[in-house]
Regions:
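N-terminal Rossmann NAD(P)H-binding glycine-rich loop of SDR-like oxidoreductase domains
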Residues: 4-24
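NAD(P)H-binding glycine-rich loop region in Rossmannoid oxidoreductase-like domains
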Residues: 37, 47-85, 96, 114-116
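Glycine-rich NAD(P)-binding loop of the Rossmann-fold in SDR/ketoreductase-type enzymes
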Residues: 51, 81-92, 129, 133, ...
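Conserved Rossmann-fold NAD(P)-dependent oxidoreductase catalytic core, especially the SDR/UDP-sugar
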Residues: 92-134, 148-149, 156
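Glycine-rich "substrate-gating" loop/helix at the edge of Rossmann-like oxidoreductase active sites
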Residues: 132, 161-169, 189-200, 224-226, ...
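Substrate-positioning beta->alpha
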Residues: 141, 169-174, 188-211, 217-218
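Conserved beta-loop-beta element that borders a ligand/cofactor-binding pocket
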Residues: 143-166
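Mid/C-terminal beta-alpha module of Rossmann-like enzyme folds, strongest
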Residues: 210-270, 286, 302-309, 319-326, ...
Length: 341
């Protein structure tokens, strides 16, 4: 039975990747600093850091496929540590994969490598990268390492938009709290921008296909195939869950003037990438995904929001969870918005 190693397999996306590869008939080996919430049949867990070459070599032994998904995420606000984990960790993983003669190496990157779009055109794999914050820069550098290794290793890159699905909390917990109480929903700008999301299941499917189909040296942008403007998607979501919240736009200039200061004072959980693109049209073309992997993402933006919200209602989250994507966000001063009439 083929073995796939998934780094960061205990986190939000890692859980979906594990389920996908188990369904494909693989044995799954997870390498993570944290144990998974549950260990299913067919799953082996190794606790360790992707920067530890000895542990990485042990985890890579006998593996057919490596999915390198481990990373420090933006909500951690980890500064210089982004490069240490996301770049150096990728370098260690690539070396281990080459030494172990792995059949396939897939790197899970991020849409943040493109920075803030300067127009409303769809982002393609040929669009120039222009990251501006530590997380996006670290992901772009890690991508370069992967591309440089493609002569020695069958490597592909999966680049998701903002990932959503049942089990995802983080920033979404603030939105869902407003919806649950029929409170106003605050957005940056007027909401007429197209803002694409992607379902965790669709990302996992793209990774699975890239592990099986010939796509050496290829990168794939992955995002929803069906979505409208931010306002349209939120309105459709609210109707689906029987919510009567009013969507209220906050002037973008005001948010961009105040949020950096609040961030420095540790009063806001938002990072610069989030509030600099929130009112922009940001979406991937999925043509390459459809052409080479013959895959069309299944879920629309509003369907993702609806499914994630219903999960939120049915599953109280663990406030002590170490995964920043799987526990409610500390809203900081933003929690006061709930009391604005």
């Amino acid at each position: 039975m083929p073995i796939v190693l998934i780094t960061g397999g205990s986190g939000f996306l890692g859980t979906y990747l594990t389920e996908r590869f188990l369904a494909d008939g693989h044995t799954v080996r997870i390498l993570d600093v944290l144990p998974p919430e549950k260990v299913s049949t067919g799953v082996e867990f190794i606790q360790g850091d992707v920067r530890d070459s000895e542990i990485v070599a042990k985890a890579s032994a006998g593996v057919n496929v490596i999915v390198h998904n481990a990373a420090l995420v933006p909500l951690s606000k980890s500064g210089d540590a982004f490069r240490d984990v996301n770049v150096r960790g990728t370098s260690v993983m690539l070396k281990a994969a080459i030494d172990a003669k792995i059949n396939k190496f897939i790197f899970v990157s991020s849409s943040s490598v493109y920075g803030v779009p300067n127009n409303s055109d769809p982002i393609t794999e040929e669009t120039a990268q222009n990251p501006f914050e530590a997380y996006g820069i670290s992901k772009a550098e890690a991508e370069t390492l992967c591309q440089n290794a493609k002569d020695a290793l069958d490597v592909s890159i999966i680049r998701p938009r903002t990932i959503l699905g049942p089990g995802r909390m983080g920033l979404m917990s603030l939105l869902f709290d407003w919806v649950e109480t029929n409170h106003r929903i605050y957005i940056l700008g007027n909401g007429n921008n197209r803002y694409q999301l992607v379902a965790a299941e669709d990302v996992a499917e793209a990774v699975s296909l890239a592990s099986r189909l010939p796509c050496r040296g290829q990168d794939f942008n992955v995002g929803a195939d069906r979505f409208g403007t931010l306002r349209e998607d939120l309105e459709q979501f609210c109707r689906a869950v029987g919510n009567k919240s009013k969507i209220v736009g906050v002037p973008s200039w005001l948010a961009r003037a105040t949020l950096p200061i609040l961030g420095l004072l540790r009063l806001s959980p938002l990072v610069s990438y989030q509030y600099r693109i929130a009112d922009k049209t940001v979406y991937f073309s999925t043509e390459k995904l459809k052409t080479i992997l013959s895959f069309t993402p299944k879920y629309s933006n509003s369907e993702m929001l609806t499914r994630a919200y219903r999960w939120y209602k049915d599953h109280p989250t663990d406030p002590n969870s170490a995964s920043l994507h799987r526990k409610k966000m500390n809203a900081g001063i933003l929690r006061l918005l709930k009391y604005v009439p």
